[in-house]
Amino acid sequence: MSNENHEELNDQLIVRREKVDTLREEGIDPFGEKFIRSISPEEIETKFADKSKEELEEAAIEVSVAGRIMTKRVKGKVGFTHIQDRFHQLQIYIRKDAIGEDAYAVFKLADLGDIIGIKGTIFRTNTGELSVKATEFTLLSKSLRPLPDKYHGLKDVEQRYRQRYLDLITNEESQNRFVMRSKILKYTRDYMDNQGFLEVETPVLHTIAGGAAAKPFITHHNALDMELYLRIALELHLKRLIVGGMDKVYEIGRVFRNEGTSTRHNPEFTMLESYAAYEDYEDVMDLVEGLVSTVCKQVNGTTEITYGEYNVDLTPNWRRIHMADAVKEYVGVDFWNVTSDEEARELAKKHNVPVTEHMTYGHILNEFFETYVEEKLIQPTFVYGHPVEISPLAKKNKEDDRFTDRFELFIVGREHANAFSELNDPIDQRERFEAQMKEREQGNDEAHGMDADFLEALEYGLPPTGGLGIGIDRLVMLLTDAPSIRDILLFPTMKHRD
Protein backbone atom coordinates (compact mmCIF):
# COMPACT_ATOMS: atom_id res chain seq x y z
CA MET A 1 0.00 0.00 0.00
CA SER A 2 1.41 3.42 -0.93
CA ASN A 3 2.02 6.24 1.55
CA GLU A 4 -0.81 8.14 -0.13
CA ASN A 5 -3.22 5.29 0.65
CA HIS A 6 -1.98 5.19 4.25
CA GLU A 7 -2.74 8.92 4.53
CA GLU A 8 -6.18 8.41 2.99
CA LEU A 9 -6.98 5.65 5.49
CA ASN A 10 -5.77 7.77 8.37
CA ASP A 11 -7.95 10.63 7.16
CA GLN A 12 -11.00 8.35 7.14
CA LEU A 13 -10.24 7.17 10.66
CA ILE A 14 -9.91 10.75 11.85
CA VAL A 15 -13.13 11.91 10.17
CA ARG A 16 -15.15 9.02 11.62
CA ARG A 17 -13.86 9.73 15.13
CA GLU A 18 -14.74 13.39 14.70
CA LYS A 19 -18.29 12.30 13.83
CA VAL A 20 -18.40 10.30 17.08
CA ASP A 21 -17.47 13.47 18.98
CA THR A 22 -20.12 15.46 17.10
CA LEU A 23 -22.82 12.92 17.93
CA ARG A 24 -21.87 12.88 21.61
CA GLU A 25 -21.96 16.68 21.74
CA GLU A 26 -25.55 16.42 20.47
CA GLY A 27 -26.39 13.94 23.24
CA ILE A 28 -26.58 10.96 20.89
CA ASP A 29 -24.93 7.65 21.81
CA PRO A 30 -22.94 6.48 18.74
CA PHE A 31 -23.05 2.94 20.10
CA GLY A 32 -26.72 2.48 20.85
CA GLU A 33 -28.74 0.03 22.88
CA LYS A 34 -31.10 -2.88 22.32
CA PHE A 35 -33.24 -2.63 19.20
CA ILE A 36 -36.26 -4.89 18.71
CA ARG A 37 -36.59 -6.19 15.15
CA SER A 38 -39.93 -7.44 13.87
CA ILE A 39 -38.60 -8.87 10.61
CA SER A 40 -35.37 -9.40 8.67
CA PRO A 41 -34.51 -8.25 5.13
CA GLU A 42 -34.60 -11.89 4.03
CA GLU A 43 -38.10 -12.37 5.46
CA ILE A 44 -39.32 -9.22 3.71
CA GLU A 45 -37.83 -10.57 0.47
CA THR A 46 -39.67 -13.90 0.71
CA LYS A 47 -42.89 -12.87 2.44
CA PHE A 48 -43.77 -9.96 0.18
CA ALA A 49 -42.20 -11.03 -3.12
CA ASP A 50 -45.59 -11.51 -4.80
CA LYS A 51 -47.21 -8.32 -3.46
CA SER A 52 -47.83 -5.50 -5.92
CA LYS A 53 -47.09 -1.83 -5.29
CA GLU A 54 -50.79 -1.12 -4.82
CA GLU A 55 -51.34 -4.05 -2.43
CA LEU A 56 -48.46 -2.89 -0.23
CA GLU A 57 -49.71 0.70 -0.19
CA GLU A 58 -53.16 -0.44 0.87
CA ALA A 59 -51.84 -2.81 3.54
CA ALA A 60 -49.47 -0.20 5.06
CA ILE A 61 -47.45 -2.89 6.84
CA GLU A 62 -45.27 -1.48 9.62
CA VAL A 63 -41.93 -3.16 10.31
CA SER A 64 -38.81 -2.75 12.39
CA VAL A 65 -35.53 -3.78 10.73
CA ALA A 66 -31.82 -3.39 11.37
CA GLY A 67 -28.60 -3.91 9.47
CA ARG A 68 -25.28 -2.55 8.27
CA ILE A 69 -25.20 0.34 5.79
CA MET A 70 -23.74 -0.90 2.50
CA THR A 71 -24.76 1.98 0.21
CA LYS A 72 -25.89 5.54 0.89
CA ARG A 73 -27.15 8.40 -1.29
CA VAL A 74 -28.32 11.75 0.03
CA LYS A 75 -29.89 14.50 -2.06
CA GLY A 76 -31.20 17.44 -0.09
CA LYS A 77 -34.03 16.32 2.16
CA VAL A 78 -34.20 12.77 0.77
CA GLY A 79 -31.86 9.79 1.13
CA PHE A 80 -31.58 6.15 0.13
CA THR A 81 -29.53 3.46 1.81
CA HIS A 82 -29.20 -0.30 1.54
CA ILE A 83 -28.78 -2.19 4.79
CA GLN A 84 -27.44 -5.73 4.94
CA ASP A 85 -28.25 -8.53 7.33
CA ARG A 86 -26.71 -11.94 6.58
CA PHE A 87 -26.16 -10.98 2.92
CA HIS A 88 -29.75 -10.01 2.33
CA GLN A 89 -29.98 -6.34 1.46
CA LEU A 90 -32.96 -4.06 1.84
CA GLN A 91 -33.40 -0.55 0.49
CA ILE A 92 -34.45 2.13 2.96
CA TYR A 93 -36.09 5.37 1.79
CA ILE A 94 -35.52 8.24 4.19
CA ARG A 95 -37.21 11.65 4.11
CA LYS A 96 -36.31 14.48 6.44
CA ASP A 97 -39.96 15.39 7.01
CA ALA A 98 -40.80 11.75 7.91
CA ILE A 99 -38.10 11.04 10.52
CA GLY A 100 -37.54 14.58 11.80
CA GLU A 101 -34.74 17.09 11.43
CA ASP A 102 -32.56 15.74 14.25
CA ALA A 103 -32.70 12.13 13.08
CA TYR A 104 -32.03 13.22 9.50
CA ALA A 105 -28.92 15.06 10.65
CA VAL A 106 -27.69 11.83 12.24
CA PHE A 107 -28.44 9.95 9.02
CA LYS A 108 -26.38 12.46 7.04
CA LEU A 109 -23.44 11.78 9.37
CA ALA A 110 -23.74 8.02 8.84
CA ASP A 111 -20.97 6.14 7.01
CA LEU A 112 -20.81 2.87 5.13
CA GLY A 113 -20.45 0.13 7.72
CA ASP A 114 -22.57 1.84 10.38
CA ILE A 115 -25.31 -0.31 11.90
CA ILE A 116 -28.75 1.29 12.02
CA GLY A 117 -32.29 0.48 13.09
CA ILE A 118 -35.31 1.52 11.02
CA LYS A 119 -39.03 1.61 11.69
CA GLY A 120 -41.32 2.22 8.76
CA THR A 121 -43.71 0.77 6.20
CA ILE A 122 -43.03 -1.62 3.34
CA PHE A 123 -43.52 -0.32 -0.18
CA ARG A 124 -42.41 -1.06 -3.70
CA THR A 125 -40.55 1.58 -5.73
CA ASN A 126 -41.42 2.57 -9.30
CA THR A 127 -38.67 0.21 -10.46
CA GLY A 128 -40.28 -2.62 -8.46
CA GLU A 129 -37.76 -2.87 -5.60
CA LEU A 130 -39.12 -3.88 -2.19
CA SER A 131 -38.16 -1.13 0.26
CA VAL A 132 -39.02 0.37 3.63
CA LYS A 133 -40.17 3.98 3.99
CA ALA A 134 -38.61 5.12 7.26
CA THR A 135 -40.61 6.80 10.00
CA GLU A 136 -37.89 6.37 12.65
CA PHE A 137 -34.09 6.20 12.32
CA THR A 138 -31.73 4.98 15.08
CA LEU A 139 -27.94 4.77 14.98
CA LEU A 140 -27.00 1.49 16.69
CA SER A 141 -23.24 1.33 16.17
CA LYS A 142 -20.78 3.72 14.54
CA SER A 143 -18.16 2.02 12.34
CA LEU A 144 -14.80 3.68 12.98
CA ARG A 145 -13.06 1.87 10.12
CA PRO A 146 -14.11 1.77 6.46
CA LEU A 147 -15.19 -1.56 5.01
CA PRO A 148 -13.16 -3.15 2.20
CA ASP A 149 -14.06 -1.89 -1.26
CA LYS A 150 -17.53 -3.27 -2.05
CA TYR A 151 -16.57 -4.21 -5.60
CA HIS A 152 -13.36 -6.03 -4.76
CA GLY A 153 -13.81 -7.18 -1.16
CA LEU A 154 -10.91 -8.92 0.58
CA LYS A 155 -8.65 -10.16 -2.20
CA ASP A 156 -5.76 -10.93 0.15
CA VAL A 157 -6.47 -14.54 1.20
CA GLU A 158 -4.38 -14.24 4.36
CA GLN A 159 -6.33 -11.13 5.40
CA ARG A 160 -9.55 -13.09 4.98
CA TYR A 161 -8.28 -15.66 7.48
CA ARG A 162 -6.88 -13.11 9.93
CA GLN A 163 -9.91 -10.81 9.80
CA ARG A 164 -12.72 -13.30 9.34
CA TYR A 165 -15.30 -10.73 10.46
CA LEU A 166 -14.54 -8.63 7.35
CA ASP A 167 -14.62 -11.73 5.17
CA LEU A 168 -18.08 -12.59 6.52
CA ILE A 169 -19.36 -9.07 5.82
CA THR A 170 -18.07 -8.94 2.25
CA ASN A 171 -18.03 -12.56 1.05
CA GLU A 172 -21.39 -14.32 0.79
CA GLU A 173 -19.79 -17.61 -0.27
CA SER A 174 -17.70 -17.64 2.90
CA GLN A 175 -20.67 -16.94 5.16
CA ASN A 176 -22.76 -19.62 3.45
CA ARG A 177 -19.94 -22.12 3.93
CA PHE A 178 -19.94 -21.57 7.70
CA VAL A 179 -23.71 -21.87 7.84
CA MET A 180 -23.30 -25.21 6.07
CA ARG A 181 -20.63 -26.24 8.57
CA SER A 182 -23.10 -25.71 11.41
CA LYS A 183 -25.73 -27.74 9.56
CA ILE A 184 -23.25 -30.56 8.91
CA LEU A 185 -22.48 -30.74 12.63
CA LYS A 186 -26.20 -30.72 13.49
CA TYR A 187 -27.08 -33.43 10.96
CA THR A 188 -24.10 -35.52 12.09
CA ARG A 189 -25.34 -35.40 15.68
CA ASP A 190 -28.88 -36.19 14.54
CA TYR A 191 -27.66 -39.24 12.62
CA MET A 192 -25.57 -40.57 15.49
CA ASP A 193 -28.40 -39.99 17.97
CA ASN A 194 -30.83 -41.81 15.68
CA GLN A 195 -28.41 -44.76 15.54
CA GLY A 196 -28.64 -45.09 19.31
CA PHE A 197 -25.34 -43.42 20.23
CA LEU A 198 -25.02 -41.27 23.36
CA GLU A 199 -23.02 -38.03 23.06
CA VAL A 200 -20.48 -37.62 25.86
CA GLU A 201 -17.68 -35.25 26.87
CA THR A 202 -14.20 -36.39 27.86
CA PRO A 203 -11.15 -34.46 29.14
CA VAL A 204 -9.16 -32.15 26.90
CA LEU A 205 -6.15 -32.25 29.25
CA HIS A 206 -4.50 -35.69 29.30
CA THR A 207 -1.76 -37.11 31.49
CA ILE A 208 -0.48 -39.18 28.53
CA ALA A 209 -0.62 -38.23 24.84
CA GLY A 210 -2.32 -41.34 23.47
CA GLY A 211 -4.86 -42.54 20.93
CA ALA A 212 -2.97 -41.41 17.83
CA ALA A 213 0.51 -41.12 16.34
CA ALA A 214 1.11 -37.38 16.68
CA LYS A 215 3.18 -34.78 18.54
CA PRO A 216 1.25 -33.17 21.42
CA PHE A 217 1.10 -29.68 22.86
CA ILE A 218 2.50 -29.77 26.38
CA THR A 219 1.35 -27.58 29.26
CA HIS A 220 1.94 -27.45 33.01
CA HIS A 221 -0.62 -27.61 35.81
CA ASN A 222 0.73 -25.29 38.50
CA ALA A 223 -1.37 -26.48 41.44
CA LEU A 224 -0.66 -30.17 40.80
CA ASP A 225 2.89 -29.49 39.56
CA MET A 226 2.55 -31.90 36.65
CA GLU A 227 2.86 -31.90 32.89
CA LEU A 228 -0.34 -32.33 30.90
CA TYR A 229 -1.00 -32.74 27.20
CA LEU A 230 -3.74 -31.26 25.04
CA ARG A 231 -5.49 -34.32 23.65
CA ILE A 232 -4.34 -35.64 20.29
CA ALA A 233 -7.35 -37.99 20.07
CA LEU A 234 -10.58 -38.82 21.91
CA GLU A 235 -10.12 -42.57 21.76
CA LEU A 236 -8.77 -43.89 25.04
CA HIS A 237 -11.28 -42.18 27.33
CA LEU A 238 -14.20 -43.22 25.12
CA LYS A 239 -13.08 -46.86 25.23
CA ARG A 240 -12.97 -46.65 29.02
CA LEU A 241 -16.68 -45.76 28.82
CA ILE A 242 -17.36 -48.91 26.78
CA VAL A 243 -15.63 -50.89 29.56
CA GLY A 244 -17.99 -49.13 31.97
CA GLY A 245 -21.07 -50.39 30.14
CA MET A 246 -21.98 -47.38 27.99
CA ASP A 247 -22.50 -49.50 24.89
CA LYS A 248 -22.65 -46.81 22.16
CA VAL A 249 -20.94 -43.45 22.68
CA TYR A 250 -19.65 -40.62 20.52
CA GLU A 251 -17.96 -37.28 20.99
CA ILE A 252 -17.48 -34.32 18.66
CA GLY A 253 -14.63 -32.24 19.99
CA ARG A 254 -11.42 -30.35 19.38
CA VAL A 255 -8.11 -32.19 19.29
CA PHE A 256 -4.65 -30.65 19.11
CA ARG A 257 -1.50 -31.77 17.30
CA ASN A 258 1.76 -29.86 17.48
CA GLU A 259 2.60 -30.32 13.83
CA GLY A 260 2.81 -28.36 10.59
CA THR A 261 0.03 -26.48 8.83
CA SER A 262 -1.13 -26.96 5.25
CA THR A 263 -4.28 -26.75 3.16
CA ARG A 264 -5.40 -29.94 4.97
CA HIS A 265 -3.90 -29.51 8.45
CA ASN A 266 -4.48 -27.09 11.31
CA PRO A 267 -2.95 -27.58 14.79
CA GLU A 268 -6.43 -27.71 16.34
CA PHE A 269 -9.26 -29.41 14.52
CA THR A 270 -12.59 -31.13 15.14
CA MET A 271 -13.01 -34.90 15.36
CA LEU A 272 -15.99 -37.20 15.61
CA GLU A 273 -15.12 -40.43 17.40
CA SER A 274 -17.62 -43.18 18.15
CA TYR A 275 -17.49 -46.61 19.77
CA ALA A 276 -20.10 -49.37 19.68
CA ALA A 277 -19.89 -52.53 21.78
CA TYR A 278 -20.44 -55.94 20.15
CA GLU A 279 -19.66 -54.58 16.66
CA ASP A 280 -16.64 -54.75 14.34
CA TYR A 281 -15.00 -52.66 11.63
CA GLU A 282 -17.39 -53.89 8.94
CA ASP A 283 -20.34 -52.56 10.96
CA VAL A 284 -18.46 -49.26 11.20
CA MET A 285 -18.09 -49.17 7.40
CA ASP A 286 -21.88 -49.32 7.15
CA LEU A 287 -22.19 -46.56 9.76
CA VAL A 288 -19.77 -44.25 7.92
CA GLU A 289 -21.37 -44.89 4.55
CA GLY A 290 -24.81 -44.08 5.94
CA LEU A 291 -23.63 -41.05 7.90
CA VAL A 292 -21.68 -39.31 5.12
CA SER A 293 -24.23 -40.01 2.36
CA THR A 294 -27.15 -38.91 4.56
CA VAL A 295 -25.51 -35.69 5.74
CA CYS A 296 -24.43 -34.89 2.18
CA LYS A 297 -28.01 -35.34 0.93
CA GLN A 298 -29.33 -33.12 3.73
CA VAL A 299 -26.98 -30.20 3.07
CA ASN A 300 -26.63 -30.44 -0.71
CA GLY A 301 -29.90 -32.07 -1.75
CA THR A 302 -27.97 -34.81 -3.56
CA THR A 303 -25.24 -37.39 -3.00
CA GLU A 304 -23.52 -36.42 -6.26
CA ILE A 305 -21.19 -33.49 -5.61
CA THR A 306 -18.28 -31.62 -7.17
CA TYR A 307 -15.01 -31.15 -5.35
CA GLY A 308 -12.51 -29.06 -7.30
CA GLU A 309 -11.99 -30.82 -10.63
CA TYR A 310 -13.67 -34.05 -9.48
CA ASN A 311 -17.24 -35.29 -9.71
CA VAL A 312 -17.82 -37.48 -6.65
CA ASP A 313 -20.70 -39.89 -6.11
CA LEU A 314 -21.32 -40.56 -2.41
CA THR A 315 -24.29 -42.83 -3.06
CA PRO A 316 -23.84 -46.19 -1.27
CA ASN A 317 -22.38 -48.84 -1.90
CA TRP A 318 -18.74 -47.77 -1.74
CA ARG A 319 -15.75 -49.79 -2.90
CA ARG A 320 -13.89 -51.90 -0.29
CA ILE A 321 -10.31 -53.09 -0.94
CA HIS A 322 -7.47 -54.55 1.16
CA MET A 323 -4.37 -52.32 1.37
CA ALA A 324 -2.14 -55.07 -0.07
CA ASP A 325 -4.55 -55.54 -3.00
CA ALA A 326 -4.63 -51.77 -3.59
CA VAL A 327 -0.82 -51.64 -3.78
CA LYS A 328 -0.83 -54.65 -6.10
CA GLU A 329 -3.48 -53.05 -8.34
CA TYR A 330 -1.91 -49.59 -8.59
CA VAL A 331 1.82 -50.38 -8.24
CA GLY A 332 2.14 -54.00 -9.33
CA VAL A 333 3.95 -55.07 -6.15
CA ASP A 334 2.45 -58.09 -4.36
CA PHE A 335 3.00 -57.67 -0.62
CA TRP A 336 0.99 -60.80 0.09
CA ASN A 337 4.06 -62.75 -1.03
CA VAL A 338 6.70 -60.60 0.67
CA THR A 339 8.11 -62.76 3.48
CA SER A 340 10.72 -60.59 5.23
CA ASP A 341 11.61 -57.05 6.22
CA GLU A 342 14.72 -57.28 4.02
CA GLU A 343 12.65 -58.16 0.95
CA ALA A 344 10.30 -55.25 1.70
CA ARG A 345 13.29 -52.89 1.98
CA GLU A 346 14.64 -54.06 -1.38
CA LEU A 347 11.27 -53.39 -3.01
CA ALA A 348 11.19 -49.94 -1.43
CA LYS A 349 14.63 -49.15 -2.80
CA LYS A 350 13.62 -50.38 -6.26
CA HIS A 351 10.47 -48.22 -6.29
CA ASN A 352 12.02 -45.11 -4.67
CA VAL A 353 9.97 -45.42 -1.49
CA PRO A 354 11.79 -43.77 1.45
CA VAL A 355 12.45 -45.93 4.53
CA THR A 356 14.00 -45.22 7.92
CA GLU A 357 15.71 -47.44 10.49
CA HIS A 358 12.62 -48.39 12.51
CA MET A 359 10.55 -49.42 9.47
CA THR A 360 9.57 -53.06 8.98
CA TYR A 361 7.29 -54.92 6.52
CA GLY A 362 4.09 -53.18 7.62
CA HIS A 363 5.57 -49.68 7.65
CA ILE A 364 6.93 -50.20 4.15
CA LEU A 365 3.62 -51.50 2.77
CA ASN A 366 1.96 -48.40 4.19
CA GLU A 367 4.63 -46.17 2.61
CA PHE A 368 3.94 -47.79 -0.78
CA PHE A 369 0.24 -47.10 -0.30
CA GLU A 370 0.73 -43.47 0.74
CA THR A 371 3.27 -42.81 -2.02
CA TYR A 372 1.53 -44.41 -5.00
CA VAL A 373 -2.11 -45.25 -4.22
CA GLU A 374 -3.75 -42.80 -1.83
CA GLU A 375 -3.96 -39.82 -4.20
CA LYS A 376 -5.60 -41.97 -6.91
CA LEU A 377 -8.64 -42.91 -4.80
CA ILE A 378 -11.10 -40.28 -5.98
CA GLN A 379 -14.44 -42.04 -5.48
CA PRO A 380 -15.24 -43.11 -1.89
CA THR A 381 -13.13 -46.18 -1.08
CA PHE A 382 -12.70 -48.15 2.13
CA VAL A 383 -9.11 -49.39 2.34
CA TYR A 384 -8.86 -52.09 5.01
CA GLY A 385 -6.27 -54.50 6.39
CA HIS A 386 -3.69 -52.05 7.71
CA PRO A 387 -0.42 -53.61 8.97
CA VAL A 388 -0.16 -54.26 12.69
CA GLU A 389 2.97 -52.06 12.99
CA ILE A 390 0.99 -48.89 12.24
CA SER A 391 -2.18 -49.91 14.09
CA PRO A 392 -1.29 -50.30 17.79
CA LEU A 393 -4.89 -50.04 18.99
CA ALA A 394 -6.57 -52.27 16.38
CA LYS A 395 -7.45 -55.97 16.62
CA LYS A 396 -5.27 -58.36 14.60
CA ASN A 397 -6.90 -60.08 11.65
CA LYS A 398 -7.55 -63.70 12.64
CA GLU A 399 -6.68 -65.03 9.16
CA ASP A 400 -3.38 -63.14 8.71
CA ASP A 401 -1.92 -61.58 11.83
CA ARG A 402 0.39 -59.29 9.83
CA PHE A 403 -2.72 -57.16 9.33
CA THR A 404 -5.47 -55.66 11.47
CA ASP A 405 -9.22 -55.30 11.17
CA ARG A 406 -8.89 -51.61 10.38
CA PHE A 407 -9.98 -49.36 7.54
CA GLU A 408 -9.52 -45.83 6.30
CA LEU A 409 -11.96 -44.02 4.03
CA PHE A 410 -10.46 -42.17 1.07
CA ILE A 411 -12.30 -39.62 -1.07
CA VAL A 412 -10.64 -37.29 -3.63
CA GLY A 413 -7.29 -38.78 -2.62
CA ARG A 414 -7.62 -37.84 1.04
CA GLU A 415 -8.27 -39.77 4.21
CA HIS A 416 -11.68 -38.90 5.67
CA ALA A 417 -12.17 -41.60 8.33
CA ASN A 418 -10.17 -44.13 10.32
CA ALA A 419 -11.78 -47.08 12.08
CA PHE A 420 -11.15 -50.55 13.41
CA SER A 421 -12.25 -53.48 15.45
CA GLU A 422 -10.77 -52.37 18.74
CA LEU A 423 -7.98 -54.34 20.34
CA ASN A 424 -9.53 -55.68 23.56
CA ASP A 425 -6.77 -58.11 24.62
CA PRO A 426 -4.86 -56.28 27.39
CA ILE A 427 -1.82 -58.58 27.07
CA ASP A 428 -1.55 -57.96 23.32
CA GLN A 429 -2.15 -54.23 23.93
CA ARG A 430 0.73 -54.08 26.42
CA GLU A 431 3.04 -55.77 23.90
CA ARG A 432 1.97 -53.27 21.21
CA PHE A 433 2.70 -50.34 23.54
CA GLU A 434 6.13 -51.83 24.31
CA ALA A 435 6.86 -52.19 20.58
CA GLN A 436 5.83 -48.57 20.08
CA MET A 437 8.18 -47.47 22.85
CA LYS A 438 11.06 -49.27 21.10
CA GLU A 439 10.18 -47.43 17.90
CA ARG A 440 10.33 -44.16 19.81
CA GLU A 441 13.84 -45.06 21.00
CA GLN A 442 14.79 -45.67 17.35
CA GLY A 443 13.63 -42.21 16.31
CA ASN A 444 9.87 -42.45 15.71
CA ASP A 445 8.79 -39.49 17.87
CA GLU A 446 5.12 -40.06 16.97
CA ALA A 447 5.00 -43.54 18.49
CA HIS A 448 2.63 -44.23 21.41
CA GLY A 449 3.75 -44.14 25.01
CA MET A 450 2.68 -46.65 27.65
CA ASP A 451 -0.75 -45.90 29.15
CA ALA A 452 -0.92 -48.02 32.31
CA ASP A 453 -4.34 -46.71 33.37
CA PHE A 454 -5.87 -47.63 30.01
CA LEU A 455 -4.32 -51.10 30.23
CA GLU A 456 -5.84 -51.53 33.69
CA ALA A 457 -9.26 -50.59 32.29
CA LEU A 458 -8.85 -53.20 29.53
CA GLU A 459 -8.09 -55.84 32.15
CA TYR A 460 -11.64 -55.45 33.49
CA GLY A 461 -12.95 -56.49 30.07
CA LEU A 462 -13.64 -54.49 26.90
CA PRO A 463 -16.32 -56.20 24.78
CA PRO A 464 -15.69 -56.57 21.03
CA THR A 465 -16.00 -52.96 19.85
CA GLY A 466 -16.13 -51.06 16.57
CA GLY A 467 -14.44 -47.67 16.79
CA LEU A 468 -14.46 -44.72 14.39
CA GLY A 469 -12.74 -41.38 13.88
CA ILE A 470 -13.89 -38.84 11.27
CA GLY A 471 -12.18 -35.51 10.64
CA ILE A 472 -15.11 -33.10 10.67
CA ASP A 473 -13.09 -30.34 9.01
CA ARG A 474 -12.19 -32.49 6.02
CA LEU A 475 -15.80 -33.62 5.75
CA VAL A 476 -16.92 -29.98 5.70
CA MET A 477 -14.28 -29.21 3.06
CA LEU A 478 -15.60 -32.05 0.92
CA LEU A 479 -19.27 -31.15 1.24
CA THR A 480 -18.73 -27.40 0.66
CA ASP A 481 -16.06 -27.69 -2.07
CA ALA A 482 -13.53 -25.78 0.03
CA PRO A 483 -9.94 -25.92 -1.29
CA SER A 484 -8.29 -25.25 2.08
CA ILE A 485 -9.03 -26.19 5.69
CA ARG A 486 -8.62 -22.49 6.50
CA ASP A 487 -11.71 -21.79 4.41
CA ILE A 488 -13.90 -23.79 6.80
CA LEU A 489 -12.32 -22.77 10.13
CA LEU A 490 -13.66 -19.45 11.36
CA PHE A 491 -10.34 -18.56 12.97
CA PRO A 492 -7.52 -20.77 11.65
CA THR A 493 -4.13 -20.80 13.37
CA MET A 494 -1.89 -18.20 11.72
CA LYS A 495 1.73 -17.22 12.15
CA HIS A 496 2.32 -13.85 13.82
CA ARG A 497 2.56 -10.95 11.43
CA ASP A 498 6.09 -9.65 10.97
From Swiss-Prot:
Where, in this chain's numbering, is Mg(2+) 2 bound?
E415
* Cofactor(s) for this UniProt protein: Mg(2+)
Top EC group: ligase
Q: List GO BP terms, alphabetically.
A: lysyl-tRNA aminoacylation
EC assignment: the record states: 6.1.1.6
Instruction: State the Gene Ontology terms under molecular function.
Output: ATP binding; catalytic activity, acting on a protein; lysine-tRNA ligase activity; magnesium ion binding; transferase activity; tRNA binding
Its recorded reaction(s) are: tRNA(Lys) + L-lysine + ATP = L-lysyl-tRNA(Lys) + AMP + diphosphate
**Co-factor remark:** Binds 3 Mg(2+) ions per subunit.
GO cellular component terms attached to this protein's record: cytosol
Q: Which domain of life is it from?
A: Bacteria
Q: Where does it primarily localize?
A: cytoplasm
Pfam families in the record, alphabetically?
Answer: tRNA-synt_2 (PF00152), tRNA_anti-codon (PF01336)
Q: Which UniProt keywords apply?
A: Aminoacyl-tRNA synthetase, ATP-binding, Cytoplasm, Ligase, Magnesium, Metal-binding, Nucleotide-binding, Protein biosynthesis
List the InterPro entries: Aa-tRNA-synt_II (IPR004364), aa-tRNA-synth_II (IPR006195), aa-tRNA-synth_II/BPL/LPL (IPR045864), Lys-tRNA-ligase_II (IPR002313), Lys-tRNA-ligase_II_bac/euk (IPR034762), Lys-tRNA-ligase_II_N (IPR044136), Lys-tRNA-synth_II_C (IPR018149), NA-bd_OB-fold (IPR012340)
Tell me the residue numbers annotated for binding Mg(2+) 1.
E408, E415
Question: In which compartments does the protein localize?
Answer: Cytoplasm
How is this protein organized at the quaternary level?
Answer: Homodimer.
Task: Give the protein family.
Answer: Belongs to the class-II aminoacyl-tRNA synthetase family.
Q: What is this protein called?
A: Lysine--tRNA ligase
